[in-house]
Amino acid sequence: MGKKSGVRGRCIGRFSTGRFLAVILLLWAAGCEPLPFHLDPLSVNGRDGGGSPPSYGALMRIAGAALVGGDYANAIAVFRRAAEIEPSAPAPFIGLGDALRATGAVDEAILAYNSALARDGSNLPAQTGLAKAYLDTGRPELAMVPLSKALAASPDNPRLLVLLGVTEDVEGQHRQAQAYYGRGLQYAPGDPALAVDLALSLALSGDFPSAIAVLQPVAMASAASAQERQTLALIYGLQGRVAEAARLGRIDLDEASVEHNLAYYQTLRGLSPEARDRAILSITANRGAAGRS
């Protein structure tokens, strides 16, 4: 099996209509509800007099399966239908926001998350979803508003603390970011995601020895991921330790990709601190915003 040519991206294919309907069949069987003879996944209404329209719970299961499977168009349609049935429930609006954000419709996602918060002002998934959407639009100062409210209610939530750290890093407030990551590690010692983000923040501050000390035990562990190893390679590259960066790169990448990354690290070293921060954050902020909850 050949080596991978990259480690950051991960694509999830869309369901075909047939696969989506198969999921619906399974969910209906699990929920013990009557199944229409023909089901249109976009309208999710009974056809040919074969049964009553699905319930709110069934719609939420269908929409959730579509969202997980990457079938965002169906997820959006079904979450909207669920919101029509239970207009006071925040959950359909949160799911709708997640699906819209996944398609790049960030402004619509912001509206959806705010709709959820209008129904439950302390809903953590809605608060973090809204913060991630604001980060997507390059407005970390707005992201801090729902995150600060969430922190007051959940001060020991590691996922929330890491998202706060990412937001502070995007604002250029690296010391504050490191404080959040450090708090997160107190509640989740050895957490790889927190270690990666803390190490990157330390590197952005120019403290390469501390960054390496934080990340090296995680990246060199037997269970380490390619992302963790290549983040350590990036930090070595930023410090100018080309041999170490190349050695780590070759664990996961082919030679052409290693050479490409080494050239990129050299380019980063030649940038101003502000431009270097922007370049590094552009390849890490999306990961942080997408993957943390």
Where are these regions (language model features)?
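Structural signature of tandem alpha-helical TPR/SEL1-like repeats
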Residues: G69-A77, A102-S115, T137-K149, E171-R183, ...
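Terminal, low-structured helical/coil segments at or just beyond the last alpha-helical repeat
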Residues: F37-L42, S222, E228, L232-S293
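Structural marker of alpha-solenoid helical repeat scaffolds
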Residues: I85, R119-D120, A153, Y187-A188, ...
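Canonical tetratricopeptide repeat
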Residues: G95, G129, L163, D197-L198, ...
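Alpha-helical segment of the N-proximal tetratricopeptide repeat
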Residues: S52-A91, G95-A102, D136
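Bacterial Sec signal peptide processing site at the extreme N-terminus
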Residues: W28-P54
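Helix-start (N-cap) detector for alpha-helical repeat units in TPR-like alpha-solenoids
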Residues: S55-Y56, P90-A91, L124-P125, P140, ...
